[in-house]
Design a protein with these regions (language model features):
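Chalcogenol-based redox active-site neighborhoods
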Residues: 23-218
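Bacterial N-terminal signal peptides that target proteins for export
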Residues: 1-8
């Protein structure tokens, strides 16, 4: 009986999402930065391009909050999409990135996680004790516009693929990777690439923080 009740609560949480705001908003509204609107069906995300801006409903701790990508301008952002709450591989990624928050902080980077689940589903998941305390926002792309803009929406299932983007302080995508649903991503590799990008130098195969970079002779 308890299992059925818990399942009913979970299904209700997923179903009753009110949707999310997925639109360009931020400093551009004050004329300081350009605004990159998310158009239906548009795929704008590629290395060297401006990261599509968004404002999404999210859960921070156990409170609802609207999160705007533009609020993170001036810092690196680790933005990763995942297929869904209450799954199997996804919680290992959510908790894995959370365990490395201090390391990302040392690299002046903030972490944001996005799925197409409702904010109510996120809250129910966080309250289920399956994740423990998570120190970064879980965002709800209920309309799927953000996942579509970043080119990671599986149109057949309506869920995001495991896409990860490193966005620099100027709001430009510097790295992206997309995994199949069955394979989780590597926190260690994400940190390695992040630090490598921050050197702004040539980093050879398997380069690790503290190792020598390549400096062509003039």
């Amino acid at each position: 009986m308890k299992i059925c009740k818990g399942l009913a609560i979970t299904l209700f949480a997923v179903w009753c999402g009110t949707g999310t705001i997925s639109a360009a908003e931020g400093p551009g509204a004050q004329g300081k930065d350009p605004v990159y609107p998310i158009a239906q069906g548009a795929v704008q995300a590629e290395i060297g391009s401006a990261a599509p801006l968004f404002v999404l409903d999210g859960v921070v701790g156990q409170e609802f909050k609207k999160i705007s990508l533009s609020d993170y301008r001036g810092r690196w952002v680790v933005l990763f999409f995942y297929p869904g709450d209450f799954t199997f591989v996804c919680p290992t990624e959510i908790t894995g990135f959370n365990a490395a928050l201090d390391e990302f902080g040392k690299a002046s980077a903030d972490v944001l996680a996005v799925s197409a689940d409702s904010k109510f589903s996120h809250l129910a998941w966080l309250k289920s004790d399956a994740l423990g305390k998570i120190g970064y926002p879980l965002l709800s792309d209920f309309t799927k516009q953000t996942a579509r803009a970043y080119g990671v929406l599986d149109e057949n299932t309506g869920t995001p693929r495991r896409g990860l983007f490193l966005i620099d302080p100027a709001g430009v995508i510097q790295y992206l990777v997309v995994h199949g649903d069955k394979v989780g991503r590597s926190v260690e590799e994400t940190l390695r690439v992040l630090v490598a990008l921050q050197t702004e130098e040539l980093c050879p195969l398997n380069w690790k923080p503290g190792a020598s970079t390549i400096r062509p002779k003039k």
